[in-house]
Amino acid sequence: MVGIWKATGSHPKGCDPFSFKEGKSLKRIDKLVRSFVNEAMSEGFELFLSPETEVLRDLSQINDDVVFFQAKGGGLFKLRRDYTATIVEFYNKNPSDTLRVWYSGFVYRYDQTGQIQNTFQLGLEIVPYNSPQDSFVVLKVLIESVLNSLTDKLLIEVGDSRVIERCIQHVPKKFRKKLLELVDRKDVSELEFFASLNNLDLKDVLKLVEASFTKRSVNQLKEFELDPSIEREIVELVEFLSKYPGVTVEIDFSLARTVEEYDGPTFILFDLKDPALIAAGGRYRVNENTLGVGGTIFVEERTWSR
């Protein structure tokens, strides 16, 4: 997704979003887009169109994550940061619609130096989510379009937001954003210091982070003492992914980025031949009564601007 997986921030394993090395042909992007669109349309997805700019009527929306500008007439506009948020907003305004859509276009964010960065996204969303088959079809489109165009060796990390939510439910909300940032960095000593500094019990969180290094095999699921329904979902997802030649599946329940927006299984795709983060997504909450599922392929600006 991203949709809502902010995978263009810091990245697991030190990987950057997908890009090309010097001298590699941009024909691969063309092949990727064609393959993605063909796969999406063959599965019944329809094109979703949305402007890159939106009138900023509520000034309380302005924060460090919002890229905005003032037009000549004085009005404030914000640039699209995330497609999934736009699709969720559309669905909530039109709740009778069933959305099975694909999209392509640019999103904008600030980097660590305060400069605006562009990322091209190819993604798809299903709202409402009805069954694990919805997750499978999203993954099918992502995996097959990537294997047909970019690489023949993928690592897919599978997690579940409910696992880490259970570990942090006792942590005061004022500490959670920073805590999840530390979990993403997987620095055990930094987490221990944070726990000591703020008098927090983070032993379950630390176990998850440590397990992300030592217990990544799907055969070790029993060691996590998961709720049976969660374990069953993960097993079904792993079984589905394992049928693809060239795909390696590992478990990482410490995947914490935007955990507050997810509600269930999550996934990240990495290229193993030319290490890079390629795609991410998962199941998320649309409103109090509705879930959705989606996934997004990321292509950074340096890929096409050379």
What are these regions (language model features)?
Residues 2-4, 8:
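Intrinsic disorder/low-complexity segments
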Residues 5, 18, 25-45, 53-55, ...:
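Positively charged, Gly/Ser-enriched RNA/tRNA-binding surfaces
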Residues 8-17:
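Intrinsically disordered, low-complexity segments enriched in serine/proline and basic residues
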Residues 17, 48-77, 101:
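Polyanion/phosphate-binding surface patch
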Residues 61-67, 170-172, 266-267:
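Short low-complexity, flexible loop/linker segments enriched in glycine and/or proline
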Residues 67-73, 173-195:
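Acidic, His- and aromatic-enriched active-site or binding-groove loops in soluble protein domains
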Residues 155-160, 250:
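Short glycine-rich phosphate-binding loop at a beta-alpha junction
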Residues 158-171:
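Short, conserved secondary-structure transition motifs
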